[in-house]
């Protein structure tokens, strides 16, 4: 791709978004997908896989803070964390901020993503790959959760959309495997798309997760790069109380963790579980 051109996201057939490409840093087909990293004056460095924006320097903090701090602070004493995907390292960066976490395992199907992101998205990982608690496993996520002998307190599925290599991370086989290696009282979260435009994705995840967990729901955040409205995150656990903790408990855990965030705070934590009525209605109709 030439510089000073427009890059078109191809996630949706009938509409989409464009980014001006100021400088192409990397563009190559890895073993699994087409990967491009380019610079844009408004959003900084942008990474896309198979024509779909995955992350940008400008707003990645919203996504990654909400995917990590919500489940980790709701759990309260997570020691072992599993990240599925997350090759750009930003999810890992946020998990390493929790000093009570003892082990962090990241399973990424594409070694190329990790290598390229270490070089071209250094602000995302911020040196977190060198954290002594971290272990990288190059494997398919479904295979890992169904074969591992490890167990985890929090599982974060930083999956792409349910197309290409990421499709398997929206299957019953994956959710069943996550339940298998999740400790009692543990929490599973996953990105579930922009519910206004990808409602079927959320409904499908809710239906499948409900076979394995007694408390299944969603929380949300507005992330500019993910076009079309609020992004939903799937939430699944067998401890229904964790979704309804008092603001005092979350506030105390937040301060004890010593976190200083750019988006997440205890008030956002509580508000994130308030969902639009159209999603409630769609879930009730299933």
Curated annotation (Swiss-Prot):
Pfam families, alphabetized: Spermine_synt_N (PF17284), Spermine_synth (PF01564)
The PABS domain, residue ranges: 5-238
Residues engaged in binding S-methyl-5'-thioadenosine: 33, 108, 140-141, 165
Main location as per UniProt: cytoplasm
Top-rank taxon, per record: Bacteria
Active site positions, chain numbering: 158
EC numbers for this chain: 2.5.1.16
One GO CC term, this protein: cytosol
Alphabetical UniProt keywords: Cytoplasm, Polyamine biosynthesis, Spermidine biosynthesis, Transferase
This protein's pathway: Amine and polyamine biosynthesis; spermidine biosynthesis; spermidine from putrescine: step 1/1
A GO term for molecular function: spermidine synthase activity
Catalytic activity annotation: S-adenosyl 3-(methylsulfanyl)propylamine + putrescine = S-methyl-5'-thioadenosine + spermidine + H(+)
UniProt subcellular location: Cytoplasm
Residue positions binding spermidine: 64, 88, 158-161
Keyword Transcription: no
GO biological process entries: spermidine biosynthetic process
Family from the record: Belongs to the spermidine/spermine synthase family.
HAMAP family xrefs: Spermidine_synth
PANTHER family in UniProt: SPERMIDINE SYNTHASE, SPERMIDINE/SPERMINE SYNTHASE
Function of the molecule: Catalyzes the irreversible transfer of a propylamine group from the amino donor S-adenosylmethioninamine (decarboxy-AdoMet) to putrescine (1,4-diaminobutane) to yield spermidine.
Subunit-structure text: Homodimer or homotetramer.
Protein name, as recorded: Polyamine aminopropyltransferase
Gene: speE
